[in-house]
Curated annotation (Swiss-Prot):
InterPro entries: Chaperonin_GroES, Chaperonin_GroES_sf, Chaprnonin_Cpn10_CS, GroES-like_sf
Subunit structure: Heptamer of 7 subunits arranged in a ring. Interacts with the chaperonin GroEL.
Molecular function terms from GO: ATP binding; metal ion binding; protein folding chaperone; protein-folding chaperone binding; unfolded protein binding
GO cellular component: cytoplasm
A Pfam family that the UniProt record links to this protein: Cpn10
Gene: groES
GO biological process, alphabetically ordered: chaperone cofactor-dependent protein refolding
The protein's name: Co-chaperonin GroES
Family recorded in the similarity comment: Belongs to the GroES chaperonin family.
PANTHER family tied to this protein: 10 KDA HEAT SHOCK PROTEIN (PTHR10772), 20 KDA CHAPERONIN, CHLOROPLASTIC (PTHR10772:SF63)
Superkingdom of origin: Archaea
Protein keywords: Chaperone, Cytoplasm
Compartment(s): Cytoplasm
Entry function: Together with the chaperonin GroEL, plays an essential role in assisting protein folding. The GroEL-GroES system forms a nano-cage that allows encapsulation of the non-native substrate proteins and provides a physical environment optimized to promote and accelerate protein folding. GroES binds to the apical surface of the GroEL ring, thereby capping the opening of the GroEL channel.
UniProt organism field: Methanosarcina barkeri (strain Fusaro / DSM 804)
Length: 92
């Protein structure tokens, strides 16, 4: 299935919450903070038709309160406005 966002939106695969600390301690669901990171699945375009400066596979941090969630094959995906993408994360 191919999903292409319309307008200045980005489809992200939500990064799962950490369930165990690096030291091996289990974090209960009630104490976990929602992680606002995701992997770019597909991107829309600017009004003039130019591509947004993100590509499939980019690891991003996003903010904002406006997002729409969908679930496909038990995986959580999120549509986020491009303006709410704060940064990309790259390995050094």
């Amino acid at each position: 299935m191919i999903i292409k966002p319309i307008g200045e939106r980005v489809l992200l695969k939500h990064q799962k919450k950490q369930e165990v600390t690096k030291g091996g301690i289990y974090i209960p669901e009630s104490a976990r903070q929602e992680k606002k990171e995701g992997i770019v699945i597909s991107v829309g375009t600017f009004e003039d038709g130019k591509e947004l400066p993100l590509k499939k596979g980019d690891h991003v941090i996003y903010g904002g309160y406006q997002s729409d969630e969908i679930e496909i094959d038990d995986e959580k995906y999120i549509f986020v406005d491009f303006k709410d993408i704060l940064a990309t994360i790259a390995e050094e």
